[in-house]
Amino acid sequence: MKQLFRQWYDLSEIKKELTTRNWFPATSGNISIKVSHEPLTFLITASGKDKTKTTPDDFLLVDHLGVPVLETELRPSAETILHTHIYNNTNAGCVLHIHTTDNNVITNLYSDAVTLQNQEIIKALDIWEEGATIHIPIIENHAHIPTLGENFRKHIQGDSGAVLIRNHGITVWGRDSFDAKKRLEAYEFLFQFHIKLLSIQGGVSNGANSYS
């Protein structure tokens, strides 16, 4: 029980911080944190909640299938399946899914992946070589959540990573809450920088492979 309360507090603090950046517009997004490994349980945001508010109903505990462990009227976030795929296939400890203008714009500039390089902040992703290059996969959005989940699952590699969903934000996971938040901040910085650079250089015709 002590671990549950500790993880609840940790996830609540992350929610507060991301809220100050307006990364949960219009109740969008969902975040989770692992509570136990065997059996697998994790806390995840309840569906349809205003994340700018802090309430006792912010999170609920679910199992490896995303089913609530305790009796509750709360429903887990619609994209819980993305979280279950990550936790069931890695040793990740925290998953963050947010919608921002920048990460949605990026998914409209590129088709299957976006390549970013030569930025010091890439070191936040535990990539240390000089002038490093990263590739972030982009998958299509699907209203049918199981289809979205299956396409997402194909890109889960390792205990930390990220996947962009076309016009549906980014999902980032890490070894723990600190690692996941650090990675999310790095990706959002890179997206913002990339978009600003393209605007200075004259738009996508001079810098990006436009996706349409």
UniProtKB/Swiss-Prot annotation:
Keyword Lyase on entry: yes
One biological process term in Gene Ontology: L-methionine salvage from methylthioadenosine
Enzyme Commission identifier(s): 4.2.1.109
Catalytic activity as recorded in UniProt: 5-(methylsulfanyl)-D-ribulose 1-phosphate = 5-methylsulfanyl-2,3-dioxopentyl phosphate + H2O
Keywords: Amino-acid biosynthesis, Lyase, Metal-binding, Methionine biosynthesis, Zinc
Broad enzyme group: lyase
UniProt GO molecular function: methylthioribulose 1-phosphate dehydratase activity; zinc ion binding
UniProt keyword Metal-binding present: yes
SMART domains: Aldolase_II
GO cellular component, one term: cytoplasm
Binding-site positions, Zn(2+): 97, 99
Pathway where this protein functions: Amino-acid biosynthesis; L-methionine biosynthesis via salvage pathway; L-methionine from S-methyl-5-thio-alpha-D-ribose 1-phosphate: step 2/6
Co-factor(s): Zn(2+)
Pfam families in the record: Aldolase_II
The record's free-text note on cofactor binding: Binds 1 zinc ion per subunit.
Superkingdom as given in the UniProt entry: Bacteria
Membrane spanning residue stretches: none
Subunit structure, as described in the record: Homotetramer.
Protein family according to the UniProt entry: Belongs to the aldolase class II family. MtnB subfamily.
Biological function: Catalyzes the dehydration of methylthioribulose-1-phosphate (MTRu-1-P) into 2,3-diketo-5-methylthiopentyl-1-phosphate (DK-MTP-1-P).
PANTHER family linked: METHYLTHIORIBULOSE-1-PHOSPHATE DEHYDRATASE
Protein name as annotated: Methylthioribulose-1-phosphate dehydratase
Origin organism lineage: Bacteria, Bacillati, Bacillota, Bacilli, Bacillales
